[in-house]
């Protein structure tokens, strides 16, 4: 088996557009941990069932700092090693190296016998030189990783090097770092593992906060993801007649969108919510086992993940037959007005919380006007009230990027209590959810759930709706559906 193979290509790819952006990101995180070794794993393959793995997706911090997307690269680890000031990459404090398992020779057992990494099984793998050229990042064989991580580990007070680890990504790397810490501790039997967890958590926090403001390359990737997602919504409308005829019509809707995600992107950014009728009042309904019925609405919350791993996150609530009823339109318009109020305050200098508060003011006023609130809108909006949350229990916005709920480890003072800044990308997604079993409201409201969600880029001139090409108003939605169904 080892002979009579054509030569392996040694051609190296051009330097990727993302390479310079990823280098700047590494420099930024280097500034925060100048004398410490930083270890950021991509993560291992995850088992779905027995010997079948899920498709691989690297950890988002790893992807952000390397520029790698799609399914690159199981078990890889990015190590930023501290060096003398000014001697690091681009004059920084660290030298970065990407450790991964390169292609195996065709004379090796791995090539034809390893179903997880052998090229006979999974296709061509990159060489060290190819990734180095593509990423502008030094590479090394993963067999050298243990020495790279554990060398000189110890307490800085006695000349050792401290490590910070992106924890709970790869348990093998967790164990390697923990063992190195234990073996070099002054008093290993009384190690403060809680303090070490806090040390590592600061790295996760910093990596998360680094993504609060997107660079130009990231913004372009968000636009790619949004465009594919809009195309997926068009596919959904075209699939509605088949969905109505099927006993699990929600799955038909889900499947139509999934096909677009795989054709135009890498994958789904998250499990699609395709919620017909009363299922739309279940916030994370993704079983998608229900029917899609004429006269009802279907709430679809979906996003395509681009090959760069950046995802969109868009929600529309569509009338299945192409036209909203009077009650459906009434609820939809209230949610749309709340979204527009949130848009109006999504400007640089305002607090992130202001976006949610603006939407809640509109919804509380509308619920009071309809006679649904047991108190005034003012009382409901007070900290002691919150009665409106019976029908709108979630936040209006979250950051968006490599994760659908991006920057989740960022400190509250920079996220929820932070100031809106140019370059941020986040959602605006108010909703109203009136459950079938809610006896506090008149019957005509029940069984209707509406959410409208768009992806917003903050610029110096205010918010730009990246998903504006997907109709939002009731009239525009109806006209759009008629055009696609004609």
Predicted regions and their residues:
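Active-site neighborhoods and metal-handling regions in enzymes and metal-associated proteins
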Residues: 1-486
